[in-house]
From Swiss-Prot:
PANTHER family: 2-OXOGLUTARATE DEHYDROGENASE, 2-OXOGLUTARATE DEHYDROGENASE COMPLEX COMPONENT E1. 2-oxoglutarate dehydrogenase (E1o) component of the 2-oxoglutarate dehydrogenase complex (OGDHC). Participates in the first step, rate limiting for the overall conversion of 2-oxoglutarate to succinyl-CoA and CO(2) catalyzed by the whole OGDHC. Catalyzes the irreversible decarboxylation of 2-oxoglutarate (alpha-ketoglutarate) via the thiamine diphosphate (ThDP) cofactor and subsequent transfer of the decarboxylated acyl intermediate on an oxidized dihydrolipoyl group that is covalently amidated to the E2 enzyme (dihydrolipoyllysine-residue succinyltransferase or DLST). Thiamine diphosphate binds at residues 312, 411, 444, 446, 676. Mg(2+) binds at residues 411, 444, 446. It is an enzyme of class 1 (oxidoreductase). Its EC number is 1.2.4.2. Signal peptide: none annotated. This is 2-oxoglutarate dehydrogenase complex component E1. Residues 1-40 form a transit peptide. There is a cross-link at residue 534 (Glycyl lysine isopeptide (Lys-Gly) (interchain with G-Cter in ubiquitin)).
Length: 1023
């Protein structure tokens, strides 16, 4: 019997490929689709003759049947034919026919059953094959789409066509189909829209429509999305027959936009042929693409678009999308014009812009902002996202329906820069989402001189977007209408689903990396083809002329009209006498400055508060303002301790921060604190978000229960990213001066992962782009034996980048000297030693009449240090931030007796005071704390030095000599005293690593620096 079944299996014809069989077994949806066909199957019947005792007889009958089917009884003939046709067990056997008048009819019926069974199976398998074919196009059709306008490369870097994509009929066999099936009609599954109004189509037409939808100039990558509704939406947009239609008016608008894009670059090339401008030649379609996205978004209710982009095509975008005055752009090419504004300025292809205008297509107001950026590719991505989030927050746009972002990328940078990945992973986090960004990749298939095969390991440069289920639309940029359609769909996707979407413009770069570069050195064959390539404007104009949409004179008139606009603007640019960087401001703050951009005053009010306000905030900070909310027992003890401090009129570090935040919220200042684990605090000191111990995910933020009409407080744990998150918070702070935006590093050591944001945006941002920013960086810092990665926020690096002159003593008699210093510096660097001073510097950040970045080296061990407490008296009305905290002990009472004046900053003060007391030197050694390191407090330190005429001067720090503050403080302190005395050093020796990881070594080093600080004879041999 086994032999019979084996023979039958061998003889069974293969009607479909193994792929289709697997598909039919593993796809329950397909089974449901063909359920009505499967109802023809006969119920299982007994086959009692197939027993072991009769196997020899059955095998003899089978062999006889193979030689001559007519040599066996008709019932055996039917049985063997059914078995070979693949009938399931129990259905092959038909009962012997009775000898009656109706026997002939019964024989005919049995014969029909024999023939029907294989037909039904073939029908099912063919339908499954067609469904598998349709799905193959949907999944992999983009691999064989005609995307490269040069016709040289496959845009996906894979030269092999997927074997299961049919581009010719010889591949039908892969699905168990053949040419005889091409004219058969197949029912279409519900997962395709190629039928339009029809539910069934011939296979030939199915293939043709799939080729049109997925294998022409658009490659749609979307089947990795795990949401059926979203996949169906995309299928409907690209599969529906005739859906990609444009009116003649739309075609003329597209042509006009291509004219502007192309002729702008040609005008710049004629006038400044030797200037770098990073032109758009080869991807001129970018301008109409962006305008289409903006038009469609405006139609859907968006009234503010924030953009970020690299250098390629930036001037064209400024001119033809944002509509910057052409003469202002042309002025940037004039090397004779001087800048009117202070600061370094930046090259023309880095500048930003802000403009409000009427969208002529929708007749609605729209605001466009292009964020200024450095040459560090993709660094502006999170900045744009942060600014977008802020603008959405300020206008109450909780769903992203009014404010959106568009990010432009180069193909090499999009694949190569890690910040792209970090930014994508912010896209759907509750406190960071902007409800969808439209990404446009200018994929010119080259990175400077690097071939794509050397620039990425993934098939496409856009594959990073798959991690957030963003659909990716690849499009041949030499087909302007395909580009326009894809951009419309991208805008609609963002409006409908509020998720990211990527448009991959596969294009080429007609010139070198810049206009002076020779690309033939490294890409000779590509550039031979490019030299032959007809510009897209010429191609499209010829197409429209052939279609009768425009005629040649109309086309030429459009060109001459725009050329005239450029010439007139060029003439006006000759009248400009000076360059104004502030004309390129990307984030104006209306009403904050005077009309000429100056602060409205040069003073700062007291940052103190009344005792009632301090007490009220303290009481809320030490309680749970929500009923039936169970907190952790350990947290109850922390809140109880806070309550006792309030009663005793003292604050620790966490409570001082709470009071600064709470008071600003009362004044209508929004506060946003972001970073890793900031809700609780890395050191479990903050606890701004309380968690119910009995109800999962139930939380309470007491800070939002302080006042009836307070501003909202946002505190959010960030993703484990520094670069992306700091960039995001910088962008958030750009949007408004009336918000305190803080980013806290988990440890200060980790800020260098975000070094690009610090070096390119925060430090020089105002100098380059006339753009102030009040972001606050909280960087936990302190040498406590925790090793080289948990000790140092690298203060030496921040101080090195301060813009004051160490060798020039400013005019100390100048009115408002301290405020003028703050106004002129590029950022403020502080290291507070008391909670009260920390409270004041946070409040001062908002009460100042201008904005500067604030770098705070925050403590770790001081968070719970019993001496690191401040009284309410230090925070009452009339009090201010103390730039310098002078000695106030016995040494200050008898300054003539002081032998040494120690200057220090931060936590080391408490080590010094403890050691001084232990050595009984409180009258001989004075200790002055410099709380604000930059701008340097020349005026206050001069008073301190003059107060102790007999004292030698020493700087004491816990950091190593080549790190920390010494190299910054020493020359400035020497300048303060006109170099009358040396400034000695007491601290750790130079080292490569910031700190030791050995506790004993740490304590030995600490004792050594304390010995140096209090040994009054140690420096005599160096005099």
């Amino acid at each position: 019997m086994f032999h019979l079944r084996t023979c039958a299996a061998k003889l069974r014809p293969l009607t479909a490929s193994q792929t289709v069989k697997t598909f039919s077994q593993n796809r329950p949806a397909a089974a449901r689709t063909f359920q009505q066909i499967r109802c023809y199957s006969a119920p299982v019947a007994a086959e009692p003759f197939l027993s072991g005792t009769s196997s020899n007889y059955v095998e003899e009958m089978y062999c006889a049947w193979l030689e001559n089917p007519k040599s066996v009884h008709k019932s055996w003939d039917i049985f063997f034919r059914n078995t070979n046709a693949g009938a399931p067990p129990g259905t092959a056997y038909q009962s012997p026919l009775p000898l009656s008048r109706g026997s002939l009819a019964a024989v005919a019926h049995a014969q029909s059953l024999v023939e029907a069974q294989p037909n039904v199976d073939k029908l099912v398998e063919d339908h499954l094959a067609v469904q598998s074919l349709i799905r193959a196009y949907q999944i992999r059709g983009h691999h064989v789409a005609q995307l490269d306008p040069l016709g040289i490369l496959d845009a996906d870097l894979d030269s092999s066509v997927p074997a299961d994509i049919i581009s010719s009929t010889d591949k039908l066999g892969f699905y168990g189909l053949d040419e005889s099936d091409l004219d058969k009609v197949f029912h279409l599954p519900t997962t395709t829209f190629i039928g339009g109004q029809e539910s069934a189509l011939p296979l030939r037409e199915i293939i043709r429509r799939l080729e049109m939808a997925y294998c022409q100039h658009i490659g749609v990558e979307f089947m990795f999305i795990n949401d059926l509704e979203q996949c169906q939406w995309i299928r409907q947009k690209f599969e529906t027959p005739g859906i990609m239609q444009f009116t003649n008016e739309e075609k003329r608008t597209l042509l006009a936009r291509l004219v502007r894009s192309t002729r702008f670059e040609e005008f710049l090339q004629r006038k400044w042929s030797s200037e770098k401008r990073f032109g758009l030649e080869g991807c001129e379609v970018l301008i109409p693409a962006l305008k289409t996205i903006i038009d469609k978004s405006s139609e859907n209710g968006v009234d503010y678009v924030i953009m970020g982009m690299p250098h390629r095509g930036r001037l064209n975008v400024l001119a033809n999308v944002i509509r910057k005055e052409l003469e202002q752009i042309f002025c940037q090419f004039d090397s004779k014009l001087e800048a009117a504004d202070e600061g370094s300025g930046d090259v023309k292809y880095h500048l930003g812009m802000y403009h409000r205008r009427i969208n002529r297509v929708t007749d609605r107001n729209i605001t466009l902002s292009l964020v200024a950026n450095p040459s560090h590719l993709e660094a502006a991505d999170p900045v744009v996202m942060g600014k977008t989030k802020a603008e959405q927050f300020y206008c109450g746009d909780t769903e992203g329906k009014k404010v959106m972002s568009i990010l432009l990328h180069g193909d090499a940078a999009f694949a190569g820069q890690g910040i792209v990945y970090e930014t994508f992973h912010l896209s759907d986090l509750p406190s960071y989402t902007t409800h969808g960004t439209v990404h446009v990749v200018v994929n010119n298939q080259i990175g400077f001189t690097t071939d794509p095969r050397m620039a990425r390991s993934s098939p496409y440069p856009t594959d990073v977007a798959r991690v957030v289920n963003a659909p990716i639309f690849h499009v041949n940029s030499d087909d302007p209408e395909a580009v326009m359609y894809v951009c419309k769909v991208a805008a609609e996707w963002r409006s409908t689903f509020h998720k990211d979407v990527v448009v991959d413009l596969v294009c080429y770069r007609r010139n070198g990396h810049n206009e002076m570069d020779e690309p033939m050195f490294t890409q000779p064959l590509m550039y031979k083809q490019i030299r032959k390539q007809k510009p897209v404007l010429q191609k499209y104009a010829e197409l429209l002329v052939s279609q009768g949409v425009v005629n040649q004179p109309e086309y030429e008139e459009e060109i001459s009209k725009y050329d005239k606009i450029c010439e007139e603007a060029f003439a006006r640019s000759k009248d400009e006498k000076i360059l104004h960087i502030k004309h390129w401001l990307d984030s104006p703050w209306p009403g904050f400055f005077t009309l000429d951009g100056q602060p409205r005053s040069m003073s700062c009010p007291s940052t103190g508060l009344t005792e009632d306000i301090l007490t009220h905030i303290g009481n809320v900070a030490s309680s749970v303002p929500v009923e039936n909310f169970t907190i952790h027992g350990g947290l109850s003890r922390i809140l109880k301790t806070r309550g006792e401090m309030v009663k005793n009129r003292t604050v620790d570090w966490a409570l001082a921060e709470y009071m600064a935040f709470g008071s600003l919220l009362k004044e209508g200042i929004h506060i946003r604190l972001s970073g890793q684990d900031v809700e609780r605090g890395t050191f479990s000191h903050r606890h701004h978000v309380l968690h119910d111990q009995n109800v999962d995910k139930r939380t309470c933020i007491p800070m939002n229960h302080l006042w009836p009409n307070q501003a909202p407080y946002t505190v959010c744990n960030s993703s484990l990213s520094e670069y992306g998150v700091l960039g995001f918070e910088l962008g958030f702070a750009m949007a408004s001066p009336n918000a305190l935006v803080l980013w806290e590093a988990q440890f200060g050591d980790f800020h260098n992962t975000a070094q690009c944001i610090i070096d390119q945006f925060i430090c020089p941002g105002q100098a380059k782009w006339v753009r102030q920013n009040g972001i606050v960086l909280l960087l936990p810092h302190g040498m406590e034996g925790m090793g080289p990665e948990h000790s140092s926020a690298r203060p030496e690096r921040f101080l090195q980048m301060c813009n004051d002159d160490p060798d020039v003593l400013p005019d100390l008699k100048e009115a408002n000297f301290d405020i003028n210093q703050l106004h002129d510096c590029n950022w403020v660097v502080v290291n507070c030693s008391t909670p009260g001073n920390f409270f004041h510097v946070l409040r001062r950040q908002i009460l100042l009449p201008f904005r500067k970045p604030l770098i705070i080296f925050t403590p770790k061990s001081l968070l719970r240090h019993p001496e690191a407490r401040s009284s309410f008296d230090e925070m009452l009305p009339g009090t201010h931030f103390q730039r310098v905290i002078p000695e106030d002990g016995p040494a200050a009472q008898n300054p003539e007796n002081v032998k040494r004046l120690l200057f220090c900053t931060g936590k080391v003060y408490y080590d010094l005071t403890r050691e001084r007391k232990a050595r009984d030197m409180v009258g001989q050694v004075a200790i002055t704390r410099i709380e604000q390191l930059s701008p340097f407090p020349f005026d206050l330190l001069l008073k301190e030095v003059q107060k102790y005429p007999n004292a030698e001067l020493a700087w004491c720090q816990e950091e190593h000599k080549n790190q920390g503050y010494y190299d910054y403080v020493k020359p400035r302190l020497r300048t303060t005293i006109s170099r009358a005395k040396p400034v000695w050093y007491a601290g750790r020796d130079p080292a490569a690593a910031p700190a030791t990881g050995n506790k004993k070594t740490h304590l030995t080093e600490l004792q050594r620096l304390l010995d140096t600080a209090f040994d009054l004879d140690v420096f005599k041999n160096f005099s």
